[in-house]
């Protein structure tokens, strides 16, 4: 009987290089307060956010991903042709299919690399790192591009105040490849679907396709005024994000810290072994609470990119890491604990050596 041949695995992996893209338009808290009843003082006190970036209409999710990817490739000393796999985490790509990753592979000259998108919201980048680590160690891939990218300005209602004022646009990317030493620890990831509605869209896409009339669902295309050619305004209601802030805050502050501790334990490290802590940039108070529960010493540098970038969902951890390395280049090669958590609720964490 013939024996199935398997790929030769790689013992270890690490992040080879990182890239980022931040849109040029900056939205201040005073700008936000034109849309909601609030103040700069209240927003800073409750969230730690001063500004967030917004992409213009002519800059797409794909464009932002490409910018971040090209920098990550350059910093890795690689070209698109050397990529085996591309993993993109996003909840704001406007096409259900085909994937952003496949389009990006073509732009980067990475064809025929495997390419796919994942939807794990603010934990998506850590999910991508977990998958890339496994793909490289199994021998199924050699170099994997992982991207977190969001144009959340496309999926928010500026006039609601549960989540929209928190969110920003941007992209972060890393290349993961083989390493002679362990550079990515075991991933701790999972979900709690009992809190599925804690962060959600207002309604499904099918509600755009049809609207209710006389107790029945009617196709939106049939609700066009024959004289004016205009569509019924109810037929074009675009889904936007909403959040139960208290539920998310409580879960992230305590359960999130537990997950982060599990990742630290799985890597065989203690808090004092860390050089940096890069949590999802959801809220400055959550970041501070998690650091307190984890009992991180003052020597651990904590990423606080949220102050300037807001919450960028899947992009937040790579963006925060990118800024951290720019401000503290001495952290390169040192261990960092990263954790993402968000809509689902889903979570993912691991310890990595910074590129």
Curated annotation (Swiss-Prot):
Compartments annotated for it: namely: Cytoplasm
* Cysteines joined through disulfide linkages: none
InterPro entries (UniProt xref): ACP_syn_III_C (IPR013747), ACP_syn_III_N (IPR013751), FabH (IPR004655), Thiolase-like (IPR016039)
Q: Where is the stretch described as ACP-binding?
A: 281-285
Which NCBIfam families does its entry note? fabH, PRK09352.1
Relay the domain remarks.
Answer: The last Arg residue of the ACP-binding site is essential for the weak association between ACP/AcpP and FabH.
Question: What functional role does this protein have?
Answer: Catalyzes the condensation reaction of fatty acid synthesis by the addition to an acyl acceptor of two carbons from malonyl-ACP. Catalyzes the first condensation reaction which initiates fatty acid synthesis and may therefore play a role in governing the total rate of fatty acid production. Possesses both acetoacetyl-ACP synthase and acetyl transacylase activities. Its substrate specificity determines the biosynthesis of branched-chain and/or straight-chain of fatty acids.
What family does the Swiss-Prot or TrEMBL record give for this protein?
Answer: Belongs to the thiolase-like superfamily. FabH family.
| PANTHER family named among the record's database cross-references | 3-OXOACYL-[ACYL-CARRIER-PROTEIN] SYNTHASE 3, BETA-KETOACYL-[ACYL-CARRIER-PROTEIN] SYNTHASE III
What this protein is called in its record is Beta-ketoacyl-[acyl-carrier-protein] synthase III
Species name for this entry?
Answer: Kocuria rhizophila (strain ATCC 9341 / DSM 348 / NBRC 103217 / DC2201)
Q: Gene that codes for this?
A: fabH
């Amino acid at each position: 009987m013939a024996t199935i041949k398997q790929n030769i695995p790689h013992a270890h992996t690490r992040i080879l290089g990182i890239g980022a893209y931040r849109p040029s338009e900056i939205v201040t808290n005073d700008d936000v307060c034109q849309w909601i009843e609030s103040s700069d003082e209240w927003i800073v006190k409750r969230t730690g956010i001063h500004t967030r970036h917004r992409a213009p209409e002519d800059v797409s999710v794909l464009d932002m991903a490409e910018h971040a990817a090209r920098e990550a490739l350059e910093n890795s000393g690689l070209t698109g042709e050397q990529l085996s796999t591309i993993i993109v985490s996003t909840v704001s790509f406007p096409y259900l299919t085909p994937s952003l990753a496949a389009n990006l592979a073509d732009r980067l000259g990475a064809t025929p690399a495997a390419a796919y998108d994942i939807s794990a919201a603010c934990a998506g980048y850590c999910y991508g790192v977990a998958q890339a680590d496994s793909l490289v160690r199994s021998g199924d891939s050699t170099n994997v591009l992982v991207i977190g990218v969001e144009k959340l300005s496309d999926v928010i209602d500026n006039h609601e105040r549960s989540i929209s004022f928190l969110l920003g646009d941007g992209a972060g990317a890393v290349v993961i490849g083989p390493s002679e030493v362990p550079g990515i620890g075991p991933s701790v990831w999972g979900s709690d679907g009992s809190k599925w509605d804690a962060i959600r869209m207002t309604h499904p896409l099918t509600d755009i396709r049809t609207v209710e009339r006389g107790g029945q669902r009617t196709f939106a295309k049939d609700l066009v005024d024959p004289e004016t050619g205009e569509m019924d305004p109810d037929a074009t209601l675009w889904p936007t994000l909403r959040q139960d802030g208290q539920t998310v805050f409580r879960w992230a502050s305590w359960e999130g810290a537990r997950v982060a501790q599990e990742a630290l334990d799985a890597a065989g490290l203690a808090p004092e072994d860390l050089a940096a802590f890069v949590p999802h940039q959801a809220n400055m108070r959550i970041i501070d609470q998690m650091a307190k529960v984890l009992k991180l010493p003052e020597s651990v540098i904590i990423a606080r990119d949220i102050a300037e970038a807001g919450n960028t969902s899947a992009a937040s951890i790579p963006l925060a890491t990118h800024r951290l390395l720019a401000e503290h280049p001495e952290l390169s090669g040192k261990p960092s604990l990263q954790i993402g958590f968000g809509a689902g609720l889903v979570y993912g964490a691991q310890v990595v050596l910074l590129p």
